[in-house]
Design a protein with these regions (language model features):
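Fe-S-dependent hydro-lyases/dehydratases of central metabolism
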Residues: 4-233
């Protein structure tokens, strides 16, 4: 799927941006996507939108998938149990040509979030607090698994926010084990499995979680009791 999002002219959203480089990029996106049989979502298409939102809402992201995309916040898909990470243009080219990428194995990090969540505390507040505790480089070289009672209580949309911003503490990727909330969110969506295939998929997805005795290279527990809404700039 090729989605035009960042290079969308405002306020009239004309077909091509006025800026030369942006215009060239959009034209190649449309041409290459069409030539190779991708669904191209250009301005004016009712399904066009911010790439990560479109992918999730249309269930192009499913538990157990491995996904690479040209944006660091691709890690957001970990909220649905996918292993996802941002990659550069050259890596996208290689990915499309070979379906593979050569990467150094990431270290594993578990962040367990506990405590009592205040009524006005959002997922954004929680991840900002985590970034504050771990530091801007606290997760460098790691894939982070979020878990704990606070995480389990989050809605799917809130988990998406959490995983989206894991890159702000330098996580290469982030993930939350899929549960019934995720299955309910995906069921019936456009590209989700249907019928008997759905039932089999859910049974498989339930196995995609860390074992109780799993070992991590780094483990952190963060208590959010007393956390209040915050702002960043």
């Amino acid at each position: 799927m090729c989605i035009r999002d960042s290079n969308s002219s405002a306020p009239d959203r004309t077909e091509f941006p006025a800026e030369e480089n942006a215009c060239t990029q959009v034209k190649y996106l449309i041409k290459n996507g069409s030539d190779f049989g991708f669904e191209v979502l250009n301005n004016g298409n009712p399904k066009q939108g911010i790439e990560h939102v479109v992918m999730v809402e249309r269930s192009k992201v499913l538990p157990g998938m491995q996904i690479g995309a040209g944006d660091s916040h691709t890690a957001m898909y970990g909220a649905l149990g996918a292993v996802a990470y941002g990659i550069g243009t050259s890596d996208i080219y290689h990915y499309l040509a070979t379906s593979t990428l050569r990467y150094k194995k990431l270290k594993n990090m578990r962040v367990r979030v506990t405590g009592a969540r205040g009524k006005t505390v959002t997922a954004k507040d929680i991840i900002l607090f985590i970034v504050k505790k771990l530091g801007a480089g606290g997760c460098t070289g790691h894939c982070v698994e979020f878990c704990g009672p606070v995480i389990s209580d989050l809605s799917v949309e809130e988990r998406l926010t959490l995983c989206n911003m894991a890159v702000e503490c330098a996580a290469r990727s982030s993930i939350i084990a899929s549960d019934q909330k995720v299955f309910d969110y995906l069921e019936g969506r456009e590209f989700a499995p249907k019928g008997e295939t759905w039932s089999k998929a859910v049974e498989f997805w339930k196995t995609l979680k860390s074992d109780e005795e799993a070992l991590f290279d780094k483990e952190v527990e963060i208590d959010i009791t007393g956390l209040e809404p915050s702002v960043t700039w």
